[in-house]
Amino acid sequence: MPLGAFVSSQEIMSTLTHNPVLGHITTFGGHPVCCAAGLAAMKFLQDNKVVEDVERKGALYEELLADHPAVKEIRRSGLLLAVELGEASKLYCLIDLFIEEGIMSDWFLYCDTAFRISPPLIITDDEIRNCVALIRKCLDRL
């Protein structure tokens, strides 16, 4: 079941209260199972300092990929990366190569010249290195 939050100014909230009526509520809003799972996940993230390491891990991806000649640019926020190739035709071929290697990725709906990397926050450095090795193997085949 999903867990979400809605944060708003009083002005916007009062509008959504009436038009549509209760337009700010969710189907599972406040469901105890969702809240318990969300609380446990937050506790794990805090106790294990997972978020504190996200920037370093994202930088590692960037460092290991940036020097490949097929990579034109890397845009990144933490562990959310867009790797720009500059040409849609190259990216379409790359996605097919990714599938052959068991890599799950795709282009962005708004940008068909870049592929996404969005690993779990708990990814290890060794897993990042293995992932980048596979990505580079595919890039080399373009």
State each model region's role:
Residues 1-142:
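Conserved N-terminal phosphate-binding loop of PLP-dependent enzymes in the Aspartate aminotransferase
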